[in-house]
Amino acid sequence: KDNEDGGSLGEIEIGVLEKAGTLGEHNLSGAVVNPSAFKELFPELSMEDFPLRRPVTKESVYVMTESKAFRIPTPPTMKNHGNYIASISEIVRWMGEKAEGLGINVFPGFPVDSLLVEGDKVIGVRTTPAGLDRNGEPSGADAMPAMDLTAQVTVLAEGTRGPLSQAWLDWQGVTSENPQIFALGVKEVWEVKKPLDRIIHTMAWPLPSDAFGGSFMYPLSDTEIAVGLVVGLDYRDGRFDVHNELQRMKLHPLFRQYLEGGEMVEWGAKTIPEGGYYSVPKRRHGDGVILVGDAAGYVEVSSLKGIHYAMHSGIMAARQIFVALKKGDTSEAALAGYTTAVDQSVIMKDLKERRNMRLAFKGGFLSGGVKATLMSLTKGALPGGKISIEEDAADTKRLGAAADKVVPDGKLTFSKVDAVYKSGNQTRDDIPSHLLVGE
């Protein structure tokens, strides 16, 4: 439509660099997806055409104890009528096919090392050399040197605390009112014999009272279930282990009845930006660069949503880039319309209404629940003001008695080693270390 309204840009090259070997390999989510961005991006398609597994028809929310599960009314922010259960990996593969069909160049297997800059302008990226040994020397026929790729505009869509996004924010001194805080999610996909007829969310056990988080169980099909546990990284117990608690959780009757006798076929883990409205960078554009999706912090925790925000932000970025290229100007001022568009969109509207929802739980589960209820009823007006927070690493940790470790049985519960095998990780043992500790 922009092409129709504003005329064609002529021949331009658009490239997508994906660090995974194939599209979708490094994407992980629950996921229950709001389809609004699909409808906006592909208005000519019907819901049946989109890469979504099934609509949400039933849902339940439980407060858990070690042996019981008490169903509660679904909180307003967690109601998913009109949303769809999906695999984010399948979505990414489908989107990649659509992009290639439009002539966009998609390059899987190309992780990026750094930004290319001239003065304050981002002019492209440098890829990571491939096929290096432990000492950083070429090893084998698959070795490939770094490549410099230049672009009029570079869009950073690299997820939670992406290294290029963080480097650009630090370099340009772009801040947010609160620091970003994060959660860690661990997920398994199971082939099961007993079908699940609804999406399930839980809170409380197995988490301690001063940890924020909860679990999910989604039916991807009648024979496939996604189950996971997500926990804020500001938990106070220094020995807390999210993977271990997911294994413990699966022993609970609520989960065991569906998983027992089935097979765990996939495992994965990822971090999630949870800070919300006050943790979004004040500026998400610069000279030759735009940040979208999780890299910009567009996640609304109380509704467990971020995928459609990422897509909407990508659409807004594309529109502003189109205008900038038409004018032949990709400066910071020329791309400022992107940040303005997001700030005036449903993304920031939703984040603002629930701006303190996650932050309210800094004081614990019970007090946070009371505050969250008030916020839901008043659309964020009460309690008023900003709740200030520190980075997760600044929270004091305690070292009490270590929690009992679940002894994996290899059928319902699994060690981390066995779980990582199910992730499909095939990294060579002699690659350069990617974890570097500063002095």
Per-range role (PLM):
Residues 3-67, 164, 172, 345, ...:
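N-terminal FAD cofactor-binding segment of flavoenzymes
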Residues 5-11, 19, 89, 93-94, ...:
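Predominantly flavin-linked oxidoreductase catalytic cores and closely associated redox partners
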Residues 7-13, 297-303, 315, 319-368:
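Active-site-proximal substrate-binding core of FAD-dependent oxidoreductases
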Residues 50-56, 61-65, 347-439:
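Ferredoxin-type iron-sulfur electron-transfer modules and their immediate structural context
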Residues 69-90, 97, 230-232:
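Helix-loop-beta segment of a Rossmann-like dinucleotide-binding subdomain
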Residues 85, 295-308:
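Glycine-rich phosphate/pyrophosphate-binding beta-alpha loops
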Residues 257-269, 328-335:
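Flexible, glycine/charged-enriched surface loops at secondary-structure junctions
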Residues 269-297, 301, 426-439:
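FAD-binding beta-loop-beta segment adjacent to the flavin cofactor pocket
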